[in-house]
């Protein structure tokens, strides 16, 4: 696609931060990125990372990495390690050590007691189903819990016994006492603590009660001195509760919450629950499968940190929602790799060519530039009597407009000579297994005399080329909105069965023999590829297609 028409890095938060600093409201900006460690980061998180770390960098502030680890049943150290790796890979470093909401559990417990003593929190014995019924709906007010008027002394006693482990999971909960008739349902006596007898990856078995996200979020911001607490729009209705807690607790500072529109990318799913389902049910090879929308998946596919940062800059930051075309992300990586990826040749479907009039035993060393514009040096290809071309570059009965090799026709070999197809050798089934060609020895680096050769094809030497595996990745979903499915179906019905094609027996030029994991190339005429982070080995490389040379989706 051509360069997308987008505002120049629109960001409604930038003037807010600038004004706060200029007015002296804040001496320094402090932001935070607070993921829950219950899955791998995805492309939507990249927008939040670039926003929070980017604002801090731009205005000379700091950004904390804080793990919102209040739900031990779904969290794991694997996710913590992956998140830290992904943030660093994107090019950012958090202030000091990483932080954990669980580090504040003692303080949060004390603040819960503060609310109980102030008559603003109570222990409720309603079951989850009963509490849901009492809560009401958007059109009907809720009803007060029958346990709402317990005395301060009884609530303190029950809360202490909750912590001591006397009650089973779900038997009781600590709730804030706000307003069961509030139009904003988040203010209808929200839960502060639940009983969960679960081992925690940071605190072990110290706690059997865990604070809710809403109770943890703002107070963690206050403890860390966050000035601008930036989250996505679905938390806009939670802001009154965020502020209620700050109003009613002796917090050391008062952060402010701002909301922006989350990233919605077509042909993509970013629900961590559904991404986990794809992994658990074997639809993909793992969280870092190159078809996944996870940052580790994009990394393994060959996306660069710079391309993802550029994409996030292109789409900007605003409060209006909408769906972003995945073509913008693909545009960003094409721009990056076109400028920075070394060129190489790889034949995906090798067809042997014998150049019958080329001298037996002769080998020429041909120098080809590693990049057409940047000074990256040259790579050397041996040229001799036998080479490989791609089977798709020869047609006995070509369609209209075909400019590659045909019987009696000529093409130029990239960086080499003009050859003519003289004879096609077939096996018993009629498949072409070899071409006999002749070359024009006067066409190295110049056009043939008296005729024009339009087609140029890539090639590799038969001797010296390396065998490799090439994985052709495409979009995991075949429809723009994979969440939408037929009645009774699921998003899994929209999986693109052609999202991965594995080609073995490909032949690559010698310079690719020792490609480093994650090293990126443009395979001339084929697309942009990278050596696989996990499976590629010296002498046995595996290349993943990052993106095609141009947007050909649906064509």
From Swiss-Prot:
It catalyses: tRNA(Gln) + L-glutamine + ATP = L-glutaminyl-tRNA(Gln) + AMP + diphosphate. L-glutamine binds at residues 68, 213. Its EC number is 6.1.1.18. It comes from the Bacteria. One of its GO terms (molecular function) is glutamine-tRNA ligase activity. InterPro entries: aa-tRNA-synth_I_CS (IPR001412), Gln-tRNA-synth (IPR004514), Gln/Glu-tRNA_Ligase (IPR050132), Gln_tRNA_ligase_bac (IPR022861), Glu/Gln-tRNA-synth (IPR000924), Glu/Gln-tRNA-synth_Ib_cat-dom (IPR020058), Glu/Gln-tRNA-synth_Ib_codon-bd (IPR020059), Rbsml_bL25/Gln-tRNA_synth_N (IPR020056). It holds the Pfam family tRNA-synt_1c_C. Its main location: cytoplasm. A motif ('HIGH' region) lies at residues 35-45. Gene3D superfamilies: HUPs, Ribosomal Protein L25, Chain P. Keywords: Aminoacyl-tRNA synthetase, ATP-binding, Cytoplasm, Ligase, Nucleotide-binding, Protein biosynthesis. GO terms for biological process: glutaminyl-tRNA aminoacylation; glutamyl-tRNA aminoacylation. ATP binds at residues 36-38, 42-48, 232, 262-263. A motif ('KMSKS' region) lies at residues 269-273. It is found in: Cytoplasm. GO terms for cellular component: cytosol. Belongs to the class-I aminoacyl-tRNA synthetase family. Monomer. This is Glutamine--tRNA ligase. It comes from Azotobacter vinelandii (strain DJ / ATCC BAA-1303). The lineage of its organism: Bacteria, Pseudomonadati, Pseudomonadota, Gammaproteobacteria, Pseudomonadales.
């Amino acid at each position: 696609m051509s360069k997308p028409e987008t505002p120049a890095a629109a960001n409604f938060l930038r003037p807010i931060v600038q004004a706060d600093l200029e007015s002296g409201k804040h001496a320094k900006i402090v932001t935070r990125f607070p993921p829950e460690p219950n899955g791998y980061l995805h492309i939507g998180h990249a927008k939040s990372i670039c926003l929070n770390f980017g604002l801090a960098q731009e205005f000379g502030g700091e950004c904390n990495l804080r793990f919102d680890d209040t739900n031990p049943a779904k969290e794991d150290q694997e996710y913590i390690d992956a998140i830290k790796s992904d943030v660093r890979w994107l090019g950012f470093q958090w202030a000091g050590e990483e932080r954990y909401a669980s580090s504040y559990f003692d303080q949060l417990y004390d603040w819960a007691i503060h609310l109980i003593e102030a008559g603003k929190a109570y222990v409720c014995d309603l079951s989850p189903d009963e509490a849901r019924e009492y809560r009401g709906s958007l059109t009907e007010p809720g009803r007060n819990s029958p346990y709402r008027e317990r005395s301060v002394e009884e609530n303190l006693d029950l809360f202490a016994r909750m912590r001591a482990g006397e009650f089973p999971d779900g038997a009781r909960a600590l709730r804030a006492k706000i307003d069961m008739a509030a139009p904003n349902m988040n203010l209808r006596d929200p839960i502060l603590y639940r009983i969960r007898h679960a081992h925690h990856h940071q605190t072990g078995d110290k706690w059997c009660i865990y604070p809710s996200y809403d109770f943890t979020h703002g107070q963690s911001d206050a403890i860390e001195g966050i000035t601008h607490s930036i989250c996505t729009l679905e938390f806009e209705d939670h802001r009154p509760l965020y502020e209620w807690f700050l109003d009613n607790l002796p917090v050391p500072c008062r952060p402010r919450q701002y909301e922006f529109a989350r990233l919605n990318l077509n042909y993509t799913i970013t629900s961590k629950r559904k991404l986990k389902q794809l992994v658990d049910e074997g639809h993909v090879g793992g969280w870092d499968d190159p078809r996944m929308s996870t940052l580790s998946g994009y990394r393994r596919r060959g996306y660069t940190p710079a391309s993802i940062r550029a994409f996030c800059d292109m789409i900007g930051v605003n409060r209006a929602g909408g769906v972003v075309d995945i073509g913008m992300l693909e545009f960003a990586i094409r721009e990056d790799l076109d400028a920075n990826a070394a060129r190489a040749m790889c034949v995906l479907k090798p067809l042997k060519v014998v150049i019958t009039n080329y001298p037996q035993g002769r080998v020429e060393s041909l120098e080809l530039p590693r990049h057409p514009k940047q000074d990256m040096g040259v790579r050397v290809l041996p040229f001799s009597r036998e080479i490989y071309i791609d089977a798709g570059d020869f047609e006995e009965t070509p369609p209209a407009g075909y400019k590659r090799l045909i019987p009696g026709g000529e093409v130029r070999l990239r960086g080499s000579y003009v050859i003519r197809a003289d004879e096609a050798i077939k096996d018993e089934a009629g498949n072409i297994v070899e071409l006999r060609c002749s070359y024009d020895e006067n066409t190295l680096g110049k056009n043939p005399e008296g005729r024009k050769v339009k087609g140029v094809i890539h090639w590799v030497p038969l001797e010296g080329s390396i065998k490799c595996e090439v994985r052709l990745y495409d979009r995991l979903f075949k429809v723009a909105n994979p969440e939408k499915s037929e009645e009774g179906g699921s998003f899994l019905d929209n999986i693109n069965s052609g999202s991965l094609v594995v080609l073995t027996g490909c032949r690559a030029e010698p310079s690719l023999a020792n490609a480093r994991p994650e090293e990126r190339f443009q395979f001339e005429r084929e697309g942009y590829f990278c050596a696989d982070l996990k499976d590629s080995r010296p002498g046995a490389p595996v290349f993943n297609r990052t993106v095609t040379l141009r947007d050909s989706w649906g064509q």
